[in-house]
């Protein structure tokens, strides 16, 4: 039996919980977090978005209040998310959450009215341009050795490994110290993640490759990037755009991998303009 994911709502309640005589026209936006964290990472922006939208925050399996539910393969995880998301929602996925959001748009299109990815990509791991690898297959992303190091280090000290990953996420941002502190607070305020799910999350970052599929995404799409992001480098933006030409792309200045923490006002403005369009 599949466990139901815990989630919380800001701004209103789910449509089927509304009294029959109450009309509900608020856009419904779902926020999906990244590896090693939990929905608390959105605590600074969720109240701002909730002023004009109904905001649903979900801890991914293996993280936060869903730490007891194992993170598994991509398709099963997306099906778990779909079971607690209403139809015609706006799905916003950050980092690993962006991978899940893209797959959700592909395999459960009725759930996704609009798609937003933040500091995300269809394939996180870099692919080198070598003799064995055709030049057109080369891809900018996280060096394979970095992800393998995290995988090895998890078995020794998972807390230190997560902290190191957070530092990389904040690296380069003009507000790196503030960003790092906010990310740490989000972790500490929630139950610790499951170590097995941390490992599985890294495997998803290593193995999931949606490059051949994202061109089939039919929903209006917004891709938000940080110019200083080292995990999803700015130079990768053009390659992603080629694969999904109809997507809108915004590169935020002076921010790294967590733009909604570095500049929450500008970030929310970008999101709300897309939602209202």
Q: Language-model features: where?
A:
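Conserved alpha/beta-hydrolase catalytic His-Asp/Glu region
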Residues: 155-208, 212-213
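Conserved HGGG/HGGXW glycine-rich cap/lid loop of the alpha/beta-hydrolase fold
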Residues: 8-68, 74
């Amino acid at each position: 039996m599949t466990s139901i994911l815990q989630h919380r709502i800001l701004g209103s309640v789910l449509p089927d919980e509304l009294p029959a005589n109450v009309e509900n026209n608020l856009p419904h936006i779902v926020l999906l977090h990244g590896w090693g964290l939990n929905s608390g990472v959105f605590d600074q922006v969720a109240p701002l978005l909730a002023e004009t939208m109904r905001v649903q925050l979900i801890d991914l399996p293996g993280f936060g209040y869903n730490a007891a539910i194992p993170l598994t393969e991509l398709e099963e995880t997306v099906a778990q998310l779909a079971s607690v998301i209403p139809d015609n929602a706006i799905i916003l996925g950050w980092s690993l959450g962006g991978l899940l959001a893209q797959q959700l748009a592909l395999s459960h299109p009725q759930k996704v009215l609009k798609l937003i990815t933040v500091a995300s990509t269809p394939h996180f791991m870099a692919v080198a341009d070598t003799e064995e690898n055709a030049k057109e297959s080369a891809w900018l992303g996280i060096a394979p050795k970095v992800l393998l190091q995290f995988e090895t280090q998890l078995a020794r000290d998972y807390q230190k490994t997560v902290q190191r990953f957070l530092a990389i996420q904040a690296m380069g941002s003009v507000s790196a110290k503030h960003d790092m502190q906010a990310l740490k607070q989000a972790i500490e305020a929630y139950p610790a993640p499951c170590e097995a799910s941390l490992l599985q999350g890294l495997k998803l970052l290593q193995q999931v490759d949606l490059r051949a599929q994202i061109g089939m995404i039919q929903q209006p799409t917004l891709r938000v990037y940080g110019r200083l992001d080292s995990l999803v480098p700015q130079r990768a933006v053009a390659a992603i755009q080629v694969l999904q030409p109809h997507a809108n792309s915004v590169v935020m200045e002076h921010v790294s991998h967590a733009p909604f923490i570095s500049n929450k006002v500008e970030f929310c403005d970008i999101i709300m303009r897309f939602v209202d369009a």
